[in-house]
């Protein structure tokens, strides 16, 4: 199959007009790879001035496209791109409009084309003077032989590149529901055969942005219900110990207690990611600590 571009960057955006220029400017820092990149800005029903803010970019660069659709949340944007066959790149990645890539990141990724998925480490922005180095895989740069080792808590869509064919094999995402980005990644792990990991930060995740789903309070009904749904679906995809870790988030656990709810899972979470016997010990400890809040068939 012939591709018009090496990369397609999907930028879902909802009322992030003040942040999206940094995301777009980071793509301009990709050197010769910028002109080989298709940028799809998908406005998911914003009520701010996002359209006016990105207009200078679309007017100056023919590879930056702007599209609008009714609001349906993050998953609906990915579905929209797939259903309309908009992506023309050999590899596809999703960049949230408040995140950004570091300079020459695409050059590092392109050096490892040929794999079904290419994943890199990234920074988490905490404050102007503080950021944290996050690794979605706890190993060195190279081919990942055991895909289960990718099932770590860092399931964000950032710095994850999917081969075009793999991207279109992924399950449709739920619309009008938070946290579908995590499901995209764990679903992809089940679909890919070959994964390459780059153990250096190639992007920055703005986790602390006011107003995003990460900073919303847990008593927000939409957030709480979406998190419950996420854990159940991640469990079906085989996310393993991550289910326990995500359940142990203080705010979520407190809300489970307040509502006197139990999370019903279709199966017991597998002891993935950590090496044996550490996985068994850690998984056992997490299972013990969450036994009042997680329920699954014993057989």
UniProtKB/Swiss-Prot annotation:
This is Uncharacterized glycosyltransferase MG025 homolog. Keywords: Glycosyltransferase, Transferase. CDD domains: Glyco_tranf_GTA_type. It holds the Pfam family Glycos_transf_2. Signal peptide: none annotated. One of its GO terms (biological process) is biosynthetic process. Coiled coil: none annotated. Gene3D superfamilies: Spore Coat Polysaccharide Biosynthesis Protein SpsA, Chain A. The keyword Thylakoid does not apply. GO terms for molecular function: hexosyltransferase activity. It is an enzyme of class 2 (transferase). Its EC number is 2.4.-.-. Belongs to the glycosyltransferase 2 family.
């Amino acid at each position: 199959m012939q591709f018009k571009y090496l990369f397609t960057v999907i930028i879902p955006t909802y009322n992030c007009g003040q942040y999206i220029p940094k995301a777009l400017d980071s793509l301009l820092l990709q050197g010769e790879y910028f002109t080989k990149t298709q940028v799809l800005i998908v406005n998911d029903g914003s009520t701010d001035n996002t359209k006016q803010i990105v207009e200078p970019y679309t007017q100056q660069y023919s590879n930056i496209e702007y599209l609008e659709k009714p609001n349906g949340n993050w998953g609906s944007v990915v579905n929209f791109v797939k259903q309309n066959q908009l992506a023309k790149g050999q590899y596809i990645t999703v960049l949230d409009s408040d995140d950004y890539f570091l300079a020459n990141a695409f050059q590092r990724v392109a050096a490892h084309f040929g794999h079904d998925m290419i994943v890199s480490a990234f920074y988490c922005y905490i404050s102007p003077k503080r950021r944290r180095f996050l690794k979605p895989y706890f190993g060195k740069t190279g081919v990942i032989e055991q895909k289960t080792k990718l099932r770590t808590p860092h399931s964000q869509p950032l710095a994850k590149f999917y081969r075009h064919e793999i991207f279109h094999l992924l399950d449709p995402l739920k619309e009008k529901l938070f946290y579908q980005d995590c499901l995209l990644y764990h679903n992809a792990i089940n679909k890919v055969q070959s994964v390459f990991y780059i153990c250096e930060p190639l992007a920055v995740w703005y986790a602390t942005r006011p107003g995003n789903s990460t900073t919303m309070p847990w008593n927000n009904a939409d957030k709480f219900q979406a998190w419950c749904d996420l854990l159940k679906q991640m469990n079906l995809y085989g996310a393993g110990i991550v289910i326990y870790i995500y359940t142990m988030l203080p705010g979520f656990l407190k809300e489970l207690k307040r509502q006197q709810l139990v999370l019903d899972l279709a199966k017991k979470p597998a002891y993935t990611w950590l090496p044996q016997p550490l996985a068994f010990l850690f998984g056992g400890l997490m299972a013990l600590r969450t036994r009042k809040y997680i329920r699954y068939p014993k057989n």
